[in-house]
């Protein structure tokens, strides 16, 4: 399989471990820095370019999207999905993990114990703190 790791840090330990594991399992591995990717839709076709070269040979992607790149990274994952490329993490999951409230709701719904958590407008701050 041709697999790309979407990561700004090719030299990061976690990225290197993924590259090594993929290569040891006979996959063709590469790292694509999302900040060097451009997206387009042309003639009804989704296209990703990396350093102005079309990326059309991937079977799967492993997103390693940092917090500073969340929304563009999620868009990039969706775009690859539209091209038929499998992703081990969905764009929705990336966005959910960056939203603390949504994450707390999901954990609570799955019966994972979480500490008492409160969200409210700043005009209710005194009331909220008194009930915490």
Give names to the regions the model predicted.
Residues 70-80:
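Extended catalytic core of nucleotide-activated donor transferases of GT-like folds
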Residues 62-63:
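Redox-cofactor binding/interface segments in oxidoreductases and associated redox assembly factors
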Residues 35-57, 67-71:
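Glycine-rich, highly charged phosphate/nucleotide-binding loops
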């Amino acid at each position: 399989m041709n697999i790309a790791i979407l990561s700004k840090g090719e030299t990061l330990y976690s990225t290197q471990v993924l590259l090594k594991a993929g290569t040891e399992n006979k996959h063709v591995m590469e790292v694509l820095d999302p900040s060097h990717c451009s997206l387009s839709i042309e003639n009804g076709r989704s296209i990703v370019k990396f350093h102005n070269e079309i990326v059309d040979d991937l079977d799967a992607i492993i997103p390693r999207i940092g917090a500073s790149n969340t929304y563009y990274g999620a868009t990039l994952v969706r775009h690859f999905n539209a091209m038929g490329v499998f992703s081990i993490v969905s764009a929705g999951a990336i966005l959910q993990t960056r939203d603390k409230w949504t994450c707390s709701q999901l954990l609570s719904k799955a019966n994972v114990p979480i500490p008492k958590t409160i969200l409210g407008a700043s005009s209710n701050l005194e009331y909220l703190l008194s009930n915490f």
